[in-house]
Design a protein with these regions (language model features):
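Coil-to-alpha-helix initiation sites in intrinsically disordered, low-complexity, charged segments
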Residues: 49, 119-123, 235
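Charged, low-complexity cytosol-facing tails and large interhelical loops of integral membrane proteins
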Residues: 156-241
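Amphipathic coiled-coil alpha-helices
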Residues: 26, 101, 147-149, 225, ...
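Transmembrane helical hairpin unit
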Residues: 76-188
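Short, aromatic- and cysteine-enriched interfacial helices/patches
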Residues: 3, 55, 237-240
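Long, highly hydrophobic alpha-helical transmembrane signal-anchor segments
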Residues: 1-36, 112-128
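Short low-polarity hydrophobic stretches
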Residues: 69-78, 103-107, 207, 211, ...
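Membrane-interface amphipathic/juxtamembrane segments adjacent to transmembrane helices
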Residues: 22-73
């Protein structure tokens, strides 16, 4: 079956976006998501593995959300410093979120409509111009606010190259910026402060189940790892009302 250029282009946009959205995490990591002041937390599923890590896909419809990684174990292997002032990071995000949503609409709605209805003529070129104008505007905003966003010139250059070389990658710009920061060294306390009580209770129950699975996989019952997991589990359950 031969697919038309239009169909292949749309499939390519979707495929590149989903590929760029995928995150490889360790088994003891949590994913925190911030969306317009509201927080949620996810435990990556152990069903999807790649290169010894867990494969996590954030919600593809919420590219304007920020994503942070944090480890629930006491082992700290992050090289980046802990994020001290969340407000400095969030301050430039309002305008950037608008641009990300605009780019998503251009790629997911306007581009397919123009190609299938109007073809690949002048209208198609106009859409491409609007896409790159939006991307350049995003990058200019990021460059101006790079200090608040915790980016040096090398990091910015890497983000800019990805966004310009492949427009679907630019949709994940906010996620890539937030993933460069370590949210906190005690994610359980952070979750207790940011989540609604019922959401925190559900999160603790899910993490408790994960800890039980980790304990079952331990070969030695009294190993240092087992003792650490048991102690961590007791402290975790003690945080429930």
């Amino acid at each position: 079956m031969n697919l038309s250029f239009e169909v292949l282009l749309i499939l390519g946009v979707l495929g590149f976006y989903l590929y760029d959205s995928a995150i490889l995490v360790f088994s003891n990591e949590l994913i925190f998501v911030e969306s317009y002041g509201r927080w949620s937390v996810s435990l990556p599923s152990a069903r999807w593995r790649l290169m010894g890590k867990l494969l996590f896909f954030p919600n593809p419809l919420k590219a304007d959300s920020l994503i942070f990684r944090s480890a629930w174990s006491t082992t700290n292997y992050y090289s980046n410093p802990e994020l001290e002032d969340m407000s400095k990071l969030l301050a430039p995000m309002g305008f950037l979120r608008i641009l990300v949503l605009l780019l998503k609409v251009l790629l997911a709605i306007v581009l397919p409509f123009v190609m299938f209805r109007l073809g690949t003529g002048v209208e198609f070129l106009m859409v491409l111009f609007l896409m790159y104008f939006t991307i350049i505007s995003m990058l200019c905003c990021v460059y101006i606010k790079r200090t608040n966003l915790g980016l040096d010139k090398k990091a910015f250059a890497s983000l800019a190259f990805d966004a310009i070389a492949c427009p679907p990658f630019a949709i994940n710009l906010l996620r890539k910026i937030s993933l460069r920061h370590v949210l906190c060294k005690n994610p359980i306390e952070f979750a207790a402060k940011k989540l609604e009580p019922h959401s925190f209770k559900r999160f603790v129950e899910e993490l408790d189940k994960k800890l039980s699975e980790e304990l079952e996989c331990e070969d030695e019952e009294n190993s240092l790892r087992s003792i650490e997991l048991i102690k961590y589990r007791e402290n975790l359950l003690g945080m429930l009302p």
